[in-house]
Amino acid sequence: MKNFIFISPNFPMTYWKFCRELKNNGMRVLGIGDSPYDDLLQELRDSLDEYYKVSSLENYDEVFKAVAFFTYKYGKIDWLESNNEYWLMRDAALRTEFNITTGPKLDEMDKIKFKSCMKKYYAKAGIPTARYHLVEGLEDALEFAHTVGYPVVVKPDSGVGACNTYKLQFDEDVRWFISNKDDAVYIMEEFVNGYVQTFDGIVDSKGQMLFESGNITPLSIMDIVNTQGDSVYYLVKELPEKIRKAGLATVKAFGVKSRFVHLEFFVLNEDQAGLGKKGDVIGLEAVSYTHLRAH
């Protein structure tokens, strides 16, 4: 019997269904979390073979000891997943420590976490991306902005969603940003005038698609956050062929296997010098493993 460790199986609340189906498919499902066992949904308790409570999932040493305990008791761990971007690096660290090969280890995380590193994999897939620069200070930031032209977009090179994302339209905006930013590494990109089209699906252990879908987001998350607008998206009945081709090429370039995937692309609203023509597909958030779930 294979051993599957599920980190924080009670969050989101619906994740008990993953545990149930893992058990139904012959896995030994071992949970690690910081919620008391009696607080877990009955459906989750019924789906777990054992649960190890830690005082805090933020405490790496405690979680490490929990994995070590399960390893001692049940033998080699075959899978370790949280299906939660917040724990992405920690999951990779534990896989590295315990040589769990069914998910990314620490040496594979750059292409997953850093937007600047994602771009070369988009290039490998033959998909253009916005020109970018890793900000060091005011002088180089202004130089890049003047090279590509305003507006430019800045955001953490490693980050989730639109957190700390800014659209800068003038030199004064760049000066404000440099004066007020935190110590994180920021990536500055040329602004892309387009709507977001996603490629979503399930990839099997051989890298082949089992299921494909997608949606359109007319207004970017950045604009929604910065303007306090409404979040709107809708599913497409049929994926445009150019999005499907881009999605399949990206999955292959990143070497994705045994995951759910959520890939984001811009579709240009108009011709844009240096990027492409109206309707062209531009790489956005490259395989954002934020939305990659273990399958």
Tell what function each PLM region has:
Residues 1-107:
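ATP-binding N-terminal substructure of ATP-dependent carboxylate-amine bond-forming enzymes
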Residues 16-20, 119, 142, 174, ...:
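Short amphipathic alpha-helical segments and helix-helix/interface helices
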Residues 29, 129, 186:
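Hydrophobic anchor at the start of a short beta-strand
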Residues 51-57, 133-136, 168:
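Short acidic-hydrophobic, aromatic-tinged amphipathic segments that line or gate anion-handling sites
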Residues 95-164:
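A conserved helix-loop-beta module that forms one wall/lid of the active-site cleft
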Residues 167-281:
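Internal nucleotide-binding/catalytic subdomain
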Residues 287:
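Activation of the activation-loop gatekeeper triad in protein kinase-fold domains
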Residues 290-295:
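Conserved small/polar residues in nucleotide/adenosyl-binding loops
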